[in-house]
């Protein structure tokens, strides 16, 4: 049985609660051995947005179909952005913090245009919210100057399992993130053709692992990961 296409049901529920500007958020590249982790954000007016035919979780779409949907998604959205965290950043701070870094970069970009009040995040773990630092949480009035909030700190974030398959704004974000990250890997493949990144996009195929074993890792590989 074919899966039902994503809808705006959840976004419209949020609009009814007063959250008009809703952002869908999804990541790609989490499991890759090379390249960035990338986070797409698509902001819509949940009270007035129409359904967008053809959009679904990026993993369910062929590459040319994803590419063809990008202009329609960009026109449909009130604002959109894709943020990235590099392989070196993943090695330096770990995957969850790198996801947060990429996500806050995307949110900062859309927030320069307008500030969403609510973020729907695919999955069951909120890696996007900025962790509260205890010294800030318990600081008294004499604790010194106020700390600048990180981008996105003022937004409500709600996780939803399989949101990329059920929430249209999240599915749209997944398409933008996938297309942009794929294009980055195809471009990098011109410098490093031996790894087949134009095909595997940095993921852990047998051929990719064999190429790493034969040629060694590049600066675009996640060196703290098991690569071979």
Indicate residue ranges for each PLM-predicted region:
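RNase H-like, Mg2+-dependent phosphodiesterase core
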Residues: 1-228
């Amino acid at each position: 049985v074919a899966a039902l296409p994503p809808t705006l049901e959840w976004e419209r529920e949020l609009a009814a609660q007063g959250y008009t500007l809703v952002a869908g958020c999804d990541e790609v590249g989490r499991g890759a051995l090379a390249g960035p982790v990338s986070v797409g954000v698509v902001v819509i007016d949940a009270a007035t947005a129409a359904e967008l035919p053809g959009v679904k979780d990026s993993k369910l779409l062929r590459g040319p179909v994803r590419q063809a949907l990008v202009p329609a998604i960009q026109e449909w959205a009130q604002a959109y952005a894709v943020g990235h965290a590099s392989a070196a950043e993943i090695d330096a701070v770990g995957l969850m913090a790198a996801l947060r870094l990429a996500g806050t970069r995307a949110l900062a970009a859309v927030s320069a245009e307008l500030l969403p009040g609510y973020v729907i995040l695919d999955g069951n773990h909120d890696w996007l919210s900025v962790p509260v630092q205890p010294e800030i949480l318990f600081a008294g009035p004499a604790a010194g100057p106020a700390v600048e909030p990180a981008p996105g700190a003022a937004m409500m974030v709600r996780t939803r399992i399989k949101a990329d398959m059920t929430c249209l704004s999240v599915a749209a974000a997944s398409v933008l993130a996938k297309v942009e990250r794929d294009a980055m890997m195809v471009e990098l493949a011109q410098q490093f053709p031996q790894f087949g990144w134009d095909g595997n996009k940095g993921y852990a195929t047998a051929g990719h692992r064999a190429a790493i074993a034969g040629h060694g890792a590049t600066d675009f590989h996640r060196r703290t990961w098991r690569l071979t």
